[in-house]
Design a protein with these regions (language model features):
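C-terminal alpha-helical "lid/dimerization" subdomain adjacent to the S-adenosyl-L-methionine
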Residues: 20, 26-27, 142-193
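Class I SAM-dependent methyltransferase SAM/SAH-binding core
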Residues: 49, 55-105
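A short acidic, Gly/Pro-enriched loop at the edge of an enzyme's catalytic core
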Residues: 106-116
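Conserved alpha-helix/loop element of class I SAM-dependent methyltransferases that forms part
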Residues: 27-45
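Class I SAM-dependent methyltransferase Rossmann-like catalytic core
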Residues: 4-31
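A short glycine-rich, Lys/Arg-flanked "PGG" loop and its adjoining helix->strand segment in the class I
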Residues: 129-142
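Helix-to-beta-strand junctions that scaffold the AdoMet/dcAdoMet cofactor pocket
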Residues: 66, 125, 137-139
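A short SAM/SAH-binding and catalytic strip from SAM-dependent methyltransferases
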Residues: 114-127
């Protein structure tokens, strides 16, 4: 499924021609995967969906650090998943896979996720994509929104006027029916751990 852009802060999707920047492991220096895993607090045998996984850099690293969980990296851009699949081909991991949102397998993921990671995509997510995240979660599931902080000058990431401040991001997820359980700041990012409102 291709998501419309209604409600998104950034005017257009990430350009796959810039995908090489997503494979840069120095991203882990300012946004460590271990910290994201800790915030999500997944149980062994849990299912994590990396929503908007891009080239799979974080999905693959999290799968390597947590061999007891299943990691599914989903993306709506087929070109991104080609890069993801190339990266997977160089990995011996069996607990991670790439899933296209237009594939039948994606439709079977509804209400299957113990956790959803929405990394660097909140500013790109239209209303329909937010609904998709809700649909993927089990009733007790958690979603971790981690996005660029518009209040911080930084040498990387999208323009500041294309992303939210932590308060704006918080209001966005609350307005969409999530409850914020925990918040954290990183050098260039903010994180919101959320659950579904009862």
């Amino acid at each position: 499924m291709e998501h419309d852009r209604h409600g998104a802060r950034q005017p257009e999707r990430f350009n796959p021609e810039r995908a090489a920047s997503l494979n840069d492991r120095t991203r882990f220096d300012y946004l460590p995967p271990k910290d994201l895993i800790s915030l999500l607090g997944l149980e062994p045998k849990g299912v994590l969906i990396d929503f908007g996984a891009g080239t799979g850099l974080y999905a693959i690293e999290i799968a390597a650090l947590c061999p007891e969980i299943s990691v599914l990296g989903v993306d709506e851009q087929e070109k991104m998943l080609e890069f993801f699949s190339e990266n997977l081909a160089q990995s011996p991991l069996k607990n991670v896979q790439a899933v296209w949102t237009k594939d039948e397998q994606y439709s079977r993921l509804k209400k299957n996720a113990d956790g959803v990671l929405a990394l660097n995509v909140l500013h790109e997510l239209g209303d329909r994509a937010m609904e998709e995240i809700q649909a993927l979660l089990k009733p007790s599931g958690r979603v971790l929104f981690v996005d660029w902080n518009s209040e911080i000058e930084r040498p990387v990431g999208p323009p500041q006027d294309h992303v939210y401040s932590p308060q704006e991001g918080r209001l966005r997820v609350i307005d969409f029916g999530f409850s914020v359980l925990k918040e954290r700041k990183f050098p260039y990012h903010y994180a919101l751990l959320c659950g579904l409102k009862n």
